[in-house]
Amino acid sequence: MLGIDARLFLVVAPILAAVSWAAFNIGRAAVGQLQLLIKRSRA
């Protein structure tokens, strides 16, 4: 039972890390774009 869980974890962990890293970068870029839009609309 543990062997299956360990293999599943080894497969899922890097995928989760990649997805969360991509989501973090996309979110940060989106926040930057929103801040630019807000600054432009005020100016």
UniProtKB/Swiss-Prot annotation:
Q: Which InterPro entries match?
A: PSII_PsbY
> Topology relative to the membrane, per the entry?
Single-pass membrane protein
Query: Pfam families in the record, alphabetically?
Result: PsbY
Which is a GO BP term held by this UniProt record?
Answer: photosynthesis
Q: Which UniProt keywords apply?
A: Membrane, Photosynthesis, Photosystem II, Thylakoid, Transmembrane, Transmembrane helix
Instruction: State the source organism's domain of life.
Output: Bacteria
Regions that span the bilayer = 8-26
Q: Which GO terms describe its molecular function?
A: manganese ion binding
Q: Where in the cell is it found?
A: Cellular thylakoid membrane
- GO CC annotation terms, alphabetical: photosystem II; plasma membrane-derived thylakoid membrane
Disulfide bonds, which pairs? Answer: none
Spell out the family assignment given in the record's similarity comment.
Answer: Belongs to the PsbY family.
* Its job: Loosely associated component of the core of photosystem II (PSII), it is not always seen in crystals. PSII is a light-driven water plastoquinone oxidoreductase, using light energy to abstract electrons from H(2)O, generating a proton gradient subsequently used for ATP formation.
Subunit structure, interactors included: PSII is composed of 1 copy each of membrane proteins PsbA, PsbB, PsbC, PsbD, PsbE, PsbF, PsbH, PsbI, PsbJ, PsbK, PsbL, PsbM, PsbT, PsbX, PsbY, PsbZ, Psb30/Ycf12, peripheral proteins PsbO, CyanoQ (PsbQ), PsbU, PsbV and a large number of cofactors. It forms dimeric complexes.
This chain belongs to the protein called Photosystem II reaction center protein Y
The organism of origin for this protein: Parasynechococcus marenigrum (strain WH8102)
What is the taxonomic lineage of the source species?
Answer: Bacteria, Bacillati, Cyanobacteriota, Cyanophyceae, Synechococcales
